[in-house]
Amino acid sequence: STSITIIPKNDIIGHKAQIPFTIMLNKGQSYSAVATSQLGLYHLAGSQVTADKPIAITVTDDLLEIDPCADLIGDQIVPIDKIGVEYIVIKGQLSDNNDQVYITATENNTLVTLYGSTSNSFNLSKGETKGFYYQSTSNTMYITANKPIYCFQLTGMGCELGGAIVPPIVCTGSNKVAYRRGIAAKTNQLILNVFTTTSNISL
């Protein structure tokens, strides 16, 4: 008996854009909101979801292409109280500089500044999303905002795509992190990107 209200950014199957509707789900049940258009401009970034009990939300795009590859990307998003106003994003290994970062505002009059080899500032309204390629001379992007924003990175290796929600800088994680390389990856290159302050580099 979880009540969930959805305001889709664009038209979805069975519901029009910007018109709230409510669904009821029991434990273990799921609901899929699917955009009526395959064009990225009309997908669902910036949609609003509220619930009276805890829920999990996964966002996906089932077919992104960089010739000759095609992949599904997605991640489980976090609630607004877990996002932040400061991010660092490191460029991956996609071919032809196809790495991108997407910023979504949660409040009106959100001022966002991107720092790479140069800086760029812009305003976003609530639910508005803007995407950026990395500047050709920079492998990192430092992002600040005056109000909480979501940051989603599209990256990968060669033409193999992946995507994930980027945690804000205040989400410092832990001092020790373990991970296991998959069996299928043993014949492929494995890359681990780590960022820190300049003062820590010589330690």
Model-predicted segments: where are they?
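Extracellular lectin-like interaction modules
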Residues: 1-203
